[in-house]
Amino acid sequence: MVKESAEILSEIRKNYILSTMKGGKRIDGRLPDEFRELTIIENYIPRANGSAYVALGNTRVVAGVKIEAGEPFPDTPDQGVLTTNVELLPIAFPSFEAGPPNDLAIEVSRVVDRGIRESKMISPEKLVIEQGKKVWIVFLDINVLDYDGNLIDASTIAAVAALRNAVVPASKEGGEDFKLPVSSTPISVTMVKIGDTLVCDPSLEEDQICGGRITVTTTEDGHIRAMQKGEIGAFTVEDVKKAVKMSLEVGKKLREKYFR
């Protein structure tokens, strides 16, 4: 009976969200292309080489950067290394459990990592200490503290903010510390389909009842650097065009406000 009541309530809530969307508004009053309130605090972890705390609505994440000297990959002896990891802490959401990364954590880490790599945000050739023998390895760790939808964008923003203030501890190798070389500011914008409408920065409820999810990562030069399709549902060619347009416009607004 409890399960049946929950299913009925869920269906009622879904219909309410859909009917509200038909009026051009979302259940929290936002417009389709409007992000929730965003807070970014840089240098959040004192002992990290770079860090940032991000609150996107009630979704909260912390990104930390640790940079150490190590061996390069055999196929890229003239480049530094970036490794990205996302951990969903059990305190963040009832279904999150300690242990190996689940599918959500793996997806978020891959999308964040791909956006950073494909945008050439980090200049890997500038992280070489001795070609073929020693390079700087950038460990990017993202911890989810609270989950209320849109982990991908919250994690991307935290990662970008942390990398932008990261310092390479070159003094440990006999040199002088220097800022991590970055050349762009990739921003991911995640959109879901509610009925026939695309909305960005989905809340948890919107994510749960959506008819498909798409994430587009762009840079300030107006180029698309990465795309990711998620959840069950299909997008038309027109939907994808709208998603790209929205991601470029929203990404530009976020950069101008938070990453000048």
UniProtKB/Swiss-Prot annotation:
GO molecular function, one term: mRNA 3'-UTR AU-rich region binding
Predominant subcellular localization, coarse grouping: cytoplasm
Subcellular location: Cytoplasm
Tree of life domain: Archaea
Gene3D superfamilies: GHMP Kinase, N-terminal domain
Matching Pfam families: RNase_PH, RNase_PH_C
Keywords: Cytoplasm, Exosome
GO cellular component: cytoplasmic exosome (RNase complex)
GO BP annotation list: rRNA catabolic process
CDD domains linked: RNase_PH_archRRP42 (cd11365)
The protein's assembly and partners: Component of the archaeal exosome complex. Forms a hexameric ring-like arrangement composed of 3 Rrp41-Rrp42 heterodimers. The hexameric ring associates with a trimer of Rrp4 and/or Csl4 subunits.
Family: Belongs to the RNase PH family. Rrp42 subfamily.
Protein function: Non-catalytic component of the exosome, which is a complex involved in RNA degradation. Contributes to the structuring of the Rrp41 active site.
Xref: HAMAP family: Exosome_Rrp42
Protein name per its UniProtKB record: Exosome complex component Rrp42
Origin species: Thermoplasma acidophilum (strain ATCC 25905 / DSM 1728 / JCM 9062 / NBRC 15155 / AMRC-C165)
